[in-house]
């Protein structure tokens, strides 16, 4: 009858990729729904295997903008008077926690030397800018409601302000529901109350690092289809997607 799907981005991931990072501008790159949630839409469409008939969507950039900056804020976190109290601090995310260091080239292996180099990058790139003073225009919360053929409904939320990541899905049928995330799925039978649990660690599978296999899978299909001049290798067509 219905599906609920959540894509929780995590607050520091959103700040890194969609406020400071390469995808900070929907106008220059692509909207958040495509940049972050295209695989999620594919999952919903694949589960239902029906054409979507109607869509309503709402989203906005509500938090990461100038009027929400704290007193004492500066253009860069290095110069900010309240940096130590900010969960989005570039010093906290990159220097102290060493997250997302793949964006910085030629970092030394030695921890002290590495931190010095990271701080140099933060002085000269967007990754060191205040999240309230960046050139971002991506929405930081987004909801989408869809009606599919046979009156089946689905809702999807894409949220910046979450403490954890990983897709979460609830499928509601007439005889049971299924609740799951990126690792565990639980089916509960309405009549008997019996639960069936699937617990599978897929993190070691090829290509998992690319959005849990989504990037790897779609490119594999595309390359095989082009190389063999045969669309049978495609798990989905452009019309469906």
Regions found by a protein language model. Give the residues of each.
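A surface/extracellular/periplasmic glyco- and lipid-processing/surface-interacting theme
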Residues: 133
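C-terminal helical cap and adjacent loop that interface with cofactors, partners, or active-site loops
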Residues: 138-241
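Predominantly a Rossmann-like dinucleotide-binding segment in NAD(P)-dependent oxidoreductases
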Residues: 1-129, 222
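A generic fold-level signal
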Residues: 36, 136-139
